[in-house]
């Protein structure tokens, strides 16, 4: 109802942990109600070895599977996408995200906090480069997981997610080695020739 009132998609983002139940509540809801699968957007879907398989299942039902960028193993994310394609998963239902400066944490065998940090939003661009360089993926395909797929998932397409007449002028200009050269957001120059022109409210002069 809130989505309809606000003119938004009205989605449910599900923060996945490593619990044994995984996506069982979602599949139960789909089986017992008329809620469309596209309503559910589970994220952190590569957190465990089992979660991707459940994400593939949800994607085949019309839902979405969001993967948090992970550069700890350069071959892991390219391999995960290759596996999804091999299983016939509709690849337009898969997205990548950064967790938006969210915290990450590791715990010892007794459940005590061992370390904590921040997930940098810059991991999204780094993951894109990883898919192209380490995964030998075509840049046009790699972009979809960060652009058009995400825009469709949030029902912001066609205003967002692609370059076309009438769409928001959101553009990235890349150098020959995939270095980020220029960023344009809704027609406004944010980064030009590697020089930052616009900063956020809480950003310092770094």
Describe the residue ranges of each PLM region.
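Short low-complexity, flexible loop/linker segments enriched in glycine and/or proline
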Residues: 80-85, 156, 188-191
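Short secondary-structure capping/turn micro-motifs that flank functional sites
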Residues: 73-75, 148, 182
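Active-site core of metal-dependent hydrolases
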Residues: 1-108, 113-114
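His/Asp/Glu-enriched, well-ordered alpha-helical/loop segment
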Residues: 86-173
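C-terminal cap of metal-dependent C-N hydrolases
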Residues: 162-206
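Short Asp/Glu-rich motifs
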Residues: 77, 151, 202
């Amino acid at each position: 109802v809130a989505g309809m009132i606000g003119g938004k998609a009205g989605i449910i983002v599900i923060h996945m942990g490593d619990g044994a139940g995984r996506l069982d509540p979602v599949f139960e809801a789909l089986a017992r109600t008329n809620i469309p699968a596209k309503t559910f957007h589970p994220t952190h879907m590569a957190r465990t070895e089992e979660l991707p398989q459940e994400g593939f299942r949800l994607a085949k039902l019309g839902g979405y599977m969001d993967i948090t960028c992970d550069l700890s193993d350069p071959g892991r994310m390219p391999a995960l996408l290759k596996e999804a394609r091999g299983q016939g998963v509709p690849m337009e239902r898969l997205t990548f995200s950064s967790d938006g400066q969210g915290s990450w944490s590791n715990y010892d065998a007794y459940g005590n906090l061992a370390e904590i940090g921040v997930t940098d939003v810059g991991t999204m661009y780094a993951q894109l480069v990883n898919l192209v360089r380490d995964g030998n993926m075509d840049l046009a395909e790699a972009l979809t997981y960060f652009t058009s797929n995400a825009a469709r998932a949030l029902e912001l397409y066609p205003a967002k997610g692609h370059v076309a007449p009438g769409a928001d002028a959101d553009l990235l200009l890349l150098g020959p080695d995939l270095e980020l050269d220029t960023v344009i957001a809704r027609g406004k120059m944010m980064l030009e020739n590697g020089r930052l022109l616009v900063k956020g409210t809480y950003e310092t002069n770094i």
